[in-house]
């Protein structure tokens, strides 16, 4: 079942993912992590800009949506998608590494967990730029500012090195493989 040290106490708000075992480290080093290495490919950074532009055009094309609301919806949609993709889902959809990444989110898998790499910096700065643009184009409306800043914090806080491999309120429990939900203590 597991040792008592890996059990989450009921009063704990933050749990820490255990350090990888020697077997996990060997499995992680045995093959390329296809789940997260795409962020270093040519065009991977551009697709974020294309997605933001497409979201902006889609929301602007809806007749009842104002320009200000279109920017806020673009911001919220991109931030929610980014949060789910990088910080909510754990594991990999591929079985190539013996389950070495099953407890890690995609953000924790990026660049083998190294901090301050170019890809991580880009993915950290892009939401800030989108927030600044959406705040500017909403003409600094107070309510939209609060919504946009909340979305920014929800995406930026999990990216900080201080919360690397930590789970706040135990919310990241979604695994990509159904057979792993019972076998891995989270």
Swiss-Prot record:
The keyword Protease does not apply. The chain crosses the membrane at residues 43-63, 69-89, 143-163. Keywords: Endoplasmic reticulum, Membrane, Transmembrane, Transmembrane helix. GO terms for cellular component: endoplasmic reticulum; endoplasmic reticulum membrane; serine palmitoyltransferase complex. It is a multi-pass membrane protein. The keyword Transmembrane applies. It is found in: Endoplasmic reticulum membrane. One of its GO terms (biological process) is ceramide metabolic process. PANTHER family: ORMDL PROTEINS. This is Uncharacterized protein C119.09c. It comes from Schizosaccharomyces pombe (strain 972 / ATCC 24843).
